[in-house]
Amino acid sequence: MSAEVSTTPAADNTVNGTPEATNAAATSAPEVTAVESASPSTTPSASQPHSASLYVGELDPSVTEAMLYELFSSIGQVASIRVCRDAVTRRSLGYAYVNYNNTADGERALEDLNYTLIKGKPCRIMWSQRDPALRKTGQGNVFIKNLDAAIDNKALHDTFAAFGNILSCKVAQDEFGNSKGYGFVHYETAEAANNAIKHVNGMLLNDKKVFVGHHISKKDRQSKFEEMKANFTNVYIKNIDQEVTDEEFRKMFEKFGEITSATLSRDQEGKSRGFGFVNFSTHDSAQAAVDEMNDKEIKGQKLYVGRAQKKHEREEELRKQYEAARLEKASKYQGVNLYVKNLTDDVDDEKLRELFSPFGTITSAKVMRDTVTTGETSESEKEKEKESNKENEKEGEEKTEEKPKESEEEPKKTEKKILGKSKGFGFVCFSSPDEASKAVTEMNQRMVNGKPLYVALAQRKDVRRSQLEASIQARNTIRQQQAAAAAGMPQPYMQPAVFYGPGQQGFIPAGQRGGMPFAPQPGMVMGIPGGRPGQYPGPFPGQQGGRGMGPNQQIPPNFQGIPMGAMQGPGGIPNGMGYPQMAQVQFGRGAGGRGQVPGMPMGQGIRGPGYGQGRGGAPVQGGPRPQGGRGQPAAAPPAAGREEVPATGGLTAQTLSAVPPPQQKQMLGEALYPKIQAQQPELAGKITGMLLEMDNNELLGLLEDEEALRAKVDEALSVYDEYMKNKGEGEAPAESAKPKEDAAETATEENKS
């Protein structure tokens, strides 16, 4: 039986030797069950005679563009290299594309570097083919099965290379890298494939007879398989009495039609294993035997008679049955299984049941505990055993002529599992969803033995993880959008990293510090030759020396080209989700900003008090002119092109409506931050950002109502604490009435404040 040929991901678009990014990195890694077909031609298209694109597969996940460049640049000038990665996790998909400037270098790399070890794994190189129709064609594709486990890609390639030009060669492997016993060889022509089948089919490879034939697509195999199932002739019989002989077994089924073979399965000692097979000459005879003999009792045992199935077919059927049963259990107990955590160590199953029994009928209640594997022999027994051994040694020294006494038999140490310390959480399953909902409402945050309980509906670990990842991703997206909107910049587009060779666009010559081996991205600033990595190429606005910083100590912008002062909140927290910008922060003493960093731009559209100059420095560009003494505050009109933001004190709906939406959040954040900082100094920035997701009218109400603000701060703090505590924890699935330990969360739980 063969497997379907999987398709090779599309290569980069190549224009004048420079690849354009495609969506190949966004695809998930396909399951490797077959050879990845290459182009049926050995050279790239005629429209690009001076370029050659190679597909490099079987790569270790840790392989980078730089490693591949070091290897492939030894052949010739490399135009570009890209390792394809998952769009979300950015993990390597195990393959890459290498583009040369000319076809000759690509041919030489294919010949010299194929199956070269990279990070201990032999890479597989072939021409990339962007046309999916050519990649999926089965012409010239040969399937080989019954391969010895020692045969790898290179050995298979060497065996079949004598019959024609091989485009791709692969031995299928499992997730552990072990051979599955079959492989594929894709020839350039159908004649070469026929020649290989003719000469190798039935031969011995490593003392194993191999089958070689044309590859059949999965679609064709499936239709053929369905036809075979509908016209089966082989019958499987089990629950056969061990006293039944082969002759009796055959006579049991002879009345249904001509039998080509009938056999009972026996062990090494010749005893019947209780099952056997009967193959009829026609499908009608086999169907009649199944209809009449199934569930028939013979010699006190009820027979099972049905169509004989292959192992993989039975496994797939069992897997489907298990999945259906699992989904049925999950739906049955949906909404009735509760997860309870923050339990004290003295709470056991009975006490947990007592706590929740007033809310309805409980089908099961369980506190999860550590399991300790130990032996039955106690420590005291071990000490007694050591003492007796010492006495025997002394007696042996004193009476050497006497034979030592036979030692008593040691007690057998049988391992057993005992329940240990409570993990601090458990599960309670009710008989109805209404009872469970009532228990959640009443028991969540209730103090039990000095600790507030956390009670919620139990979720499967994978469901909870996916929900958490989705919420984090959505929150990060909102932060990026708000940061870009606050800076007045378009949304950043992060292009996949591409490694360029010397002479290509975006390449920084070797030996120059501060360069980056990637194409310049939108919003990125390249380092200047001879400068520090990330140094801004040119003086920063308003940076003319001064006390706070030397004239050459430029502050580099971040990856979006926004000055760092406009993107940071208190304590260096990135101002990505409306965190208040520290316009009022002064480094040093005095309202005039004696110790303020010269040239550090304030947040866009923000002017803090004492917006002046550092001692001995030039005036900050776009700021007020000095009015005399050092560090004195001065008032001046805003610079051209910059909007003036009204003061944050006494905010009203009319005031907010007069400014753009991004600045509305900014003003609200600056007004909220001091109030929140008074309550939670360490997490003021995070809590402010969380509250800024609320509606502006609600935020205005919080500014006027201290009690409401304190309640919202406590609520945000509890949400943040739950997020931090649940990072490494998992909740058990509601698959059965009795919660399972294998889906439990970790043991350690902190007390809630």
Swiss-Prot record:
It holds the Pfam family RRM_1. CDD domains: RRM1_I_PABPs, RRM2_I_PABPs, RRM3_I_PABPs, RRM4_I_PABPs. Residues 52-130, 140-217, 233-310, 336-460 form the RRM domain. Residues 37-52 have a biased composition (Low complexity). InterPro entries: Nucleotide-bd_a/b_plait_sf, PABP-dom, PABP_1234, PABP_HYD_C, PABP_RRM1, RBD_domain_sf, RRM2_I_PABPs, RRM_dom. Its main location: cytoplasm. Residues 648-725 form the PABC domain. GO terms for cellular component: cytoplasmic stress granule; cytosol; nucleus; ribonucleoprotein complex. Residues 1-52, 367-417, 602-645, 728-753 are annotated as: Disordered. It is found in: Cytoplasm; Nucleus. GO terms for biological process: mRNA processing; mRNA transport; regulation of translation. Transmembrane segments: none annotated. Residues 1-26 have a biased composition (Polar residues). Residues 605-631 have a biased composition (Gly residues). Residues 379-417, 737-753 have a biased composition (Basic and acidic residues). One of its GO terms (molecular function) is poly(U) RNA binding. Binds the poly(A) tail of mRNA. Appears to be an important mediator of the multiple roles of the poly(A) tail in mRNA biogenesis, stability and translation. In the nucleus, involved in both mRNA cleavage and polyadenylation. Is also required for efficient mRNA export to the cytoplasm. Acts in concert with a poly(A)-specific nuclease (PAN) to affect poly(A) tail shortening, which may occur concomitantly with either nucleocytoplasmic mRNA transport or translational initiation. This is Polyadenylate-binding protein, cytoplasmic and nuclear. It comes from Aspergillus fumigatus (strain ATCC MYA-4609 / CBS 101355 / FGSC A1100 / Af293). The lineage of its organism: Eukaryota, Fungi, Dikarya, Ascomycota, Pezizomycotina.
